[in-house]
Design a protein with these regions (language model features):
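C-terminal substrate-binding/catalytic lobe of Rossmann-fold NAD(P)-dependent oxidoreductases
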Residues: 55-59, 64-183
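PAPS/PAP-binding and catalytic site of the sulfotransferase fold
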Residues: 28, 133-137, 194
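Conserved active-site and cofactor/substrate-binding residues in soluble primary-metabolism enzymes
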Residues: 9, 33-40, 87-95, 133, ...
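Short, well-ordered alpha-helices that flank and scaffold nucleotide-derived cofactor binding pockets
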Residues: 43-47, 98, 196, 200
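N-terminal Rossmann-like NAD(P) cofactor-binding subdomain of oxidoreductases
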Residues: 1-78, 82-85, 171-173, 208-210
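C-terminal helical cap and adjacent loop that interface with cofactors, partners, or active-site loops
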Residues: 22, 158-211
Length: 211
């Protein structure tokens, strides 16, 4: 790392989770797009102690802007369909694992639409976990203006494109849980999240300039 001396001073810029640390930081590291979609969905469960120790599986689909701006034959409309990439080695896997403090199996996919991410996350719950426990875990977002959570919701990319929101919903069968999370990879997954961090540092409402 070319600037290793900064690593210990950098604060992780997931605005809903580290507002006080961000407000006081000299350096904020804005999360990646896939980690944002994944962590916003999973952190409430982890913090509430509802997850078994088994590995969480994350399958996430991103629009072609997730591959960057560089011209590439593989990302041209006639070539691109839906494909997995970065199997077992995507750079966002250690970021998710470090922040969640839980082992994950993450597989990203690139699809033929411009922008947005839909993450589908599969987890095993502790045997005594109730629906009220799940709903209660996500109450941590009750006062967060840029998080839209609804039990049994099926978030869709069309509802978050060009918006600064993350949409989250969950479904369960016994102790098997599926959580769905949708963001705009260029906004909540990048630019608008950076603005949230700037707002926190300036003492402004986190949604200032975004709603």
């Amino acid at each position: 790392h070319k600037q290793a001396h900064w690593l210990r001073q950098a604060v992780y810029g997931l605005a809903e989770w580290y507002p006080h640390e961000i407000a006081e930081a000299q350096l904020v590291a804005v999360p990646g797009c896939y980690p944002t979609a994944s962590l916003m969905a999973l952190l409430p469960l982890k913090k509430a102690g509802l997850l078994k120790s088994s590995k969480v599986i994350i399958n996430a689909v991103s629009g072609v802007t997730g591959a960057g701006r560089k011209a590439s034959l593989a990302t041209q409309g006639a070539e691109l369909s839906l494909q997995a990439y970065g199997l077992f080695e995507h750079r966002h896997t250690p970021e998710i694992t470090q922040q969640l403090q839980h082992e994950v199996l993450f597989t990203p996919h690139l699809a033929q639409f411009p922008r947005g991410i839909l993450a589908t996350l599969y987890a095993e719950l502790n045997d005594d976990t109730s629906d009220d426990d799940l709903t209660g875990a996500y109450q941590c977002y009750a006062e967060q203006p840029l998080v839209r959570f609804k039990k049994l919701a099926r978030p869709a990319i069309k509802d978050v494109v060009q918006q600064p929101f993350v949409d989250i919903g969950w479904h369960r069968q016994g102790n098997q849980l599926i959580v769905l999370s949708a963001i705009d990879n260029l906004l909540k997954g990048a630019a608008s999240q950076a603005i949230q961090c700037i707002n926190l540092q300036l003492g402004l409402p986190v949604e200032e300039g975004l709603l």
